[in-house]
UniProtKB/Swiss-Prot annotation:
This is Elongation factor P. It comes from Rhodopseudomonas palustris (strain ATCC BAA-98 / CGA009). One of its GO terms (molecular function) is translation elongation factor activity. HAMAP family: EF_P. Keywords: Cytoplasm, Elongation factor, Protein biosynthesis. Pfam families: EFP, EFP_N, Elong-fact-P_C. It is found in: Cytoplasm. GO terms for cellular component: cytoplasm. Its main location: cytoplasm. InterPro entries: Elong-fact-P_C (IPR015365), NA-bd_OB-fold (IPR012340), Rib_uL2_dom2 (IPR014722), Transl_elong_fac_P/YeiP (IPR020599), Transl_elong_KOW-like (IPR013185), Transl_elong_P/YeiP_cen (IPR001059), Transl_elong_P/YeiP_CS (IPR013852), Transl_elongation_fac_P (IPR011768). One of its GO terms (biological process) is peptide biosynthetic process. SMART domains: EFP (SM01185), Elong-fact-P_C (SM00841). Involved in peptide bond synthesis. Stimulates efficient translation and peptide-bond synthesis on native or reconstituted 70S ribosomes in vitro. Probably functions indirectly by altering the affinity of the ribosome for aminoacyl-tRNA, thus increasing their reactivity as acceptors for peptidyl transferase.
Length: 188
């Protein structure tokens, strides 16, 4: 489907020269003098190469329709990440470039949304929250619990975050998958 360049947004998938690209960022620039342009940063899905393109805002670009489907995470190996569709039991392999910063939060059996073009995954969406265990943090200091200061902690997936003083090593906590920030102590 052909659309004007100014309507392209982050996460869209474009086809250019027979190759698929996922949009990382799109910005419309309106200089005081001259023609407005759309600055678009993209990543080629096939090999992960990043490119930057400039289009006039009225130029036509080929936008590809993608389908979002739920998949369960199975495992990771040297070739990539493996997911299974719960209804059909079809398995799909996703490259490290597509998974990107979501990799540390993937847990066996976790249901994620994969944006698919034909049989190729082009993007991944994690659940908003994940439950992880604190594997290393400073011990609780008496009298420090009244202040609203946070202390550094390392989670079971290797991510570093800030936690309240009452959280100790071995405690399971809920974090946002978007940035790894602390939400609450896990209820389980």
């Amino acid at each position: 489907m052909r659309v004007i360049a100014s309507s392209i947004r982050k996460g869209n998938v474009l086809e250019q020269d027979g190759k698929l690209y996922v949009v990382l960022s799109a910005e419309n620039i309106h200089p005081g003098k001259g023609t407005p342009v759309s600055q678009i940063e993209m990543r080629r899905i096939s090999d992960g190469v990043k490119i930057s393109e400039r289009y006039k805002t009225t130029d036509q670009v080929e936008k590809v329709t993608i389908e979002e489907r739920n998949y369960s995470f199975l495992y990771e190996d040297g070739e990539g990440f493996h997911f299974m569709e719960p209804e059909s039991y079809d398995q799909v392999q996703v490259t490290k470039d597509v998974v990107g910063s979501a990799a540390p939060y993937l847990q066996e059996g976790m249901v994620v949304k994969l944006s698919m073009h034909d049989t190729t995954a082009v993007a991944i969406t994690l659940p908003q929250r994940a439950t992880l265990e604190v594997v290393d943090t400073e011990p609780v200091t008496k009298g420090q619990t009244a202040s609203s200061s946070y202390k550094p902690a390392v989670l079971s997936n290797g991510v570093r975050t800030q936690v309240p003083p009452h959280i100790g090593t071995g405690t399971r906590i809920v974090v946002l998958t978007e940035d790894g920030s602390y939400v609450e102590r896990a209820k389980d």
